[in-house]
Amino acid sequence: MIDSLDLVIDTIVAREVLDSRGNPTVEAEVLLEAGAIGRAIVPSGASTGAHEAHELRDGDSRYMGKGVTKAVNHIEDRIAPALCGISSLDQASVDGTMQELDGSDNKSSLGANAILAVSMATARAAANGLGLPLYRYLGGPMASLLPVPLMNVINGGAHAANNLDFQEFMLVPHGASTFRESLRMGAEVFHTLKGLLSAQGLSTAVGDEGGFAPNLTNNDAAGDLLIQAIEKAGYSPGKDISLALDVASTEFYKDGCYAFGGGSYTSTEMVNELEKLVDRYPIISIEDGLAEDDWQGWALLTKKLGKRIQLIGDDIFVTSTKRLQQGIDQNVANSILIKVNQIGSLTETLQAIDLAGRSGYTSVISHRSGETEDTTIADLAVATRAGQIKTGSLSRSERVAKYNQLLRIEDELGTQALYAGATGQGPRGRS
């Protein structure tokens, strides 16, 4: 029998490690009284929303200013003394203590990267102390739904040095009957796409998230290539595999207009352009179709397309219950992207997912472009029954690590495992 005292936090250590772009990030280890340990590494984004929690960097000559020794020191000098002696099972108390210690609105004092590393490591330590997998510890007995992957196979925008304006062109294999099958379908299309690019003399080098980053004439050319790859791989576009976009429109929004593809568009014109894409391609999800503070544009987009497809708010919501509630009140979007480092604690992340679910919004658990071998988000997707996950392409080990963890979870669940695509709990379908 496990003694509750065994699950009390005894020691917390931190270190500076590297992410998938070669930039420093924070790793934390939480050791419990009985010896159980939890380790977590935080990710980092390239296209970050202005309203995200503050990622603390050193700003000195090391690593071109991107070192995180300040955040590491905050963990060992300030956070550890405050948390030692607290039960690892009380996640809300652990996270609340760190937020009070920080004292700012956006975690700029201690750094969201410091707080999140400890938050995630604490949950994993508690799970290990109880002898439970993380998804079961966080989600309880109902944690059995495997997510539909949104696979970013063509990278553009801030994620690639090419001429594509939109940031992500994704495959959505919702027609599979299991997660394992969905992964195979995506991999087969990925390799087929590589062959098509190579045959046209286009680059098959990959971007930050493992997708190809070719120079194409325009965004439509990317859509055409994906349809061709899906069909050549033996699948039916829209039935077996649909498409999803991350427009990341904040990146090209300036002075009230959207500048891309050689043109300049008002919010209304931008909505019309997106509607044309939905009419032309089997697109079932669009992320950040409008900029992070273009609330009126977002409302129009939702009115026009909200009943046809999933409209994900990333930069506009930044995993914040406050901003999500504002969106709910204004009928903006119908889905929220969940990035743990946008808000900076596991407790607040779970609160955002809960609010979304109670309000009829879907949640899409997401990686960042600067990732690591940490697989917490895979467990989080199953724990929360989110039904969707964005964790990159079918290459680069920091992306594949999450897919492999989901395969392990599916195997462990056995006959209890459900695939969100097969149960209708994945992305919203087309009407």
UniProtKB/Swiss-Prot annotation:
Keyword tags: Cytoplasm, Glycolysis, Lyase, Magnesium, Metal-binding, Secreted
Localization per Swiss-Prot or TrEMBL: Cytoplasm; Secreted; Cell surface
Residues of the active site: 209 (proton donor), 339 (proton acceptor)
Molecular-function GO terms, alphabetical: magnesium ion binding; phosphopyruvate hydratase activity
Major subcellular location class: cytoplasm
Function text: Catalyzes the reversible conversion of 2-phosphoglycerate (2-PG) into phosphoenolpyruvate (PEP). It is essential for the degradation of carbohydrates via glycolysis.
Protein name: Enolase
